């Protein structure tokens, strides 16, 4: 028997502010399409249930078109149950919709669904039950037990916090969590593990790397496999461009260092040391690299090589600034470099990060 653990789909999220309009529109569409593909995968691969561990929607009050889409996907996948436990983003309005026999929900008390020799039990956290939910969880040890929660693992109980130490010794085989967008797992106790499936699609440069879901294979015990499933991958790389004289040379160094995939999104950080007279390279390097992939963002994080002697007789404001920084004995060499980097960019009218 197979069960899918997924979470943090964030249908209807505001991607618009992160990218140009045409890119954000395509990514918004792909977030929806990936959920549709997930349902299709489940139906075609004999999956009996999909566990949605919170934040299916990005808002407590989803747009009608987003809710209609979600329920239509479930209605069109009748062979698969969808167990939806609301998270901190969709804690109020996600359940409003049509009644579907394969759509299962949770609430402020523990609720259980049984599939063969495994039981799935979940509860939606609130300020009222955040502490008491641990003492009310009782699971038999002679069957397989999956528990669903949404929150950040923590040492103490609280709203949107999952206190792992209070779940130990509870006969949990697999703790299916939502809230953290990066896939991760760990040992809960001698019997069970906990896991975050992560989000299905990365949406910003804080969500780099593979994204997908966890496939649970259930026999006498539960085994799990992470399945990369996103339409695209968001990649962040540092590229050393020391010594380059301009943005074009930097872009050539990037092409040599990075094996671009045309379908992916990239954040390239230019690092290293370049001559003091080299201007800000990020924006121009983006233009030179625009054809390398689906979307690219380039940040110039290089240091400027400052020769103090070259500014000894410079009568400009820049010269005065450099001499003043080097004369300050209270600053370390690293502090001087950072101040000069930011100050020279500011004097040149460039963006400071």
Model regions and ranges:
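N-terminal active-site segment of His-dependent metallophosphoesterases
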Residues: 1-68, 141, 341-342, 349-353
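Domain-start "cap" segments at the beginnings of catalytic or binding domains
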Residues: 1-22, 211, 218-237
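Acidic/glycine-enriched edge-of-secondary-structure segments
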Residues: 21-30, 119-124, 232-248
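His/Asp/Glu-rich metal-coordinating catalytic cores
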Residues: 23, 49, 58-195, 199-204, ...
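A generic secondary-structure signal
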Residues: 37-45, 72-73, 136, 256-257
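A general structural motif
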Residues: 47, 79, 142-144, 172, ...
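Accessory, non-catalytic peripheral segments of nucleic-acid enzymes
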Residues: 220-353
């Amino acid at each position: 028997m197979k069960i899918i653990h997924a979470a943090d789909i964030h249908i209807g999220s505001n991607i618009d502010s992160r990218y140009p309009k045409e890119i954000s529109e395509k990514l918004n569409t792909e977030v929806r399409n990936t959920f549709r593909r997930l349902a299709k995968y489940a139906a075609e691969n004999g999956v009996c249930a999909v566990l949605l561990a919170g934040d299916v929607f990005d808002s407590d009050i989803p747009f009608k078109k987003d809710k209609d889409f979600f329920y239509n996907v479930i209605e069109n996948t009748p062979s698969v149950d969808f167990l939806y436990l609301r998270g901190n983003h969709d804690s109020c309005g996600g359940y409003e919709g049509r009644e579907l026999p394969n759509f299962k929900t949770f609430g402020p008390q523990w609720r259980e669904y049984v599939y063969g020799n495994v039981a799935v039990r979940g509860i939606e956290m609130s300020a009222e039950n955040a502490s008491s939910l641990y003492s009310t969880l009782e699971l038999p040890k002679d069957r397989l037990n999956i528990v669903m929660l949404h929150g950040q693992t923590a040492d103490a109980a609280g709203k949107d916090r999952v206190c792992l130490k209070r779940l130990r010794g509870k006969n949990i085989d697999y703790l299916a969590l939502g809230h953290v967008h990066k896939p991760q797992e760990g040992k809960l106790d001698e019997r069970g593990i906990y896991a975050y499936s992560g989000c299905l699609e990365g949406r910003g440069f804080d969500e780099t790397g593979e994204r997908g879901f966890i496939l649970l294979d259930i026999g006498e015990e539960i085994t799990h496999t992470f399945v990369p499933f996103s339409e695209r991958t968001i990649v962040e790389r540092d590229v050393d461009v020391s010594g380059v004289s301009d943005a074009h040379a930097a872009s050539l160094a990037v092409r040599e260092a990075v094996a671009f995939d045309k379908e992916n999104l990239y954040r390239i950080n230019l690092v290293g040391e370049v001559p003091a007279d080299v201007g800000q390279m990020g924006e121009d390097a983006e233009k030179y690299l625009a054809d390398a992939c689906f979307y690219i963002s380039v940040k110039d994080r290089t240091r400027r090589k400052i020769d103090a002697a070259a500014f000894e007789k410079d009568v400009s404001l820049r010269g005065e600034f450099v001499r003043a920084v080097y004369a300050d004995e209270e600053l370390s060499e690293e502090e001087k470099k950072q101040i000069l980097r930011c100050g020279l960019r500011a004097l040149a009218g460039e963006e400071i990060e």
